[in-house]
Amino acid sequence: AVNNKTPHIDALARQGIKFNSAYNSVSMSTPTRHCVYTGMYPMHHGGYANHSSVNADVKSLPTYLGNLGYRVGLAGKWHIKPLANFPFEDVPGFPKGCTSPNTDYHTKGIEKFMERDASQPFCLVLASINSHAPWTGGDASVFDRKKLQLPPQFIDTEVTREYYARYLAEVGLLDQQVGDAMQILKEKNLLQNTLVIFISEQGTQFAGAKWTNWSAGVKSAMVASWPGVIKPGMETSAIVQYEDLLPTFIDVAGGKVPDVIDGKSLVDVFQGKTKTHHKYAYHVHNNVPEGPAYPIRSISDGRYRLIWNLTPEETYVEKHIEKAEWYLSWKAQDTDQAHKIMNRYKNRPEFELYDIKKDPFEMNNLADMKKYSKKKAELTMELQKWMKQQNDTGADKDRPRAPKNKQKKAANV
């Protein structure tokens, strides 16, 4: 990272493979986890809105690997529903509440889980709450606010720099947790026989990242290490999504990946047998319950990203961001650049098209340029094809519906 040093995550990447085109499908907490643990795209598992539940018949990681003889534990943040569909063993030591100001943790629980029964293989999810807001962990004093390099979609204010330093401090704390976990594996002589995958959750909780379908929200950090299988120092630009993790684990455990799972095993990518994986990455967004409905769908082929804002006549509002101190400092700025950034965030056209190689921060919309009309048409067609396959009816699917009794009462009046 330009601003922050992540020595433990960097070391993990050097030991194995770095994914340059890894994506989540929904850039918010609960549905991201649902996708990881079920291997299904958001509309397929049903829990595509934040704080929502997956469909009753959906199975998940602990069930699949449990049936293959593994014990499956989860330490840290849960944020999945309903719990009956996710029968993880609860491993203590890491905070579960993502908005808690307390970021203290200990590793005793994960140590005991790892060494409990040497005859039984294990799968452990260490789900850190860092770097989720309110950014109270780590040491922010190490960052010189004036020297921080802000992303171009940020409005540069003193308050922004202060909160960005706090965010980076929590990234540093997350990196330390990765180092702690790797040290335990080493001390327990488990490192040589363990597949370790690190992924980020979603983009940072600044405007234009989390809760959006721009790259800053859906593009993810992902590295994997597996001695004897993954060669050190590998990199890949293969398009992968979080739905690929569960089928990978099933494959590694010797199981057969069921047809209901949307993702594909990454083992061939790990072994360098292929340089490609998916042709496209897909993303959905539904703002409810974080604000008024604002449905978005998007697709990327690795070079271009198409974003389809299904209700462009609406103004985008995300309730957590609206109250943030740094965001209030943005609104107070009266410059052309500040107005441009705020308008990009709040008022969006129906279609956005970006060359993510030349314009990684997606500041130059190509959707209305004749030169890119063929690419726009191709990606629009492929996105609509995927939506149909996923039984995604678009804007109507995302608008909240009143409970049946309230609907009946309104009709009688």
PLM feature spans:
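Formylglycine-dependent sulfatase
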Residues: 1-352, 360-399, 403-413
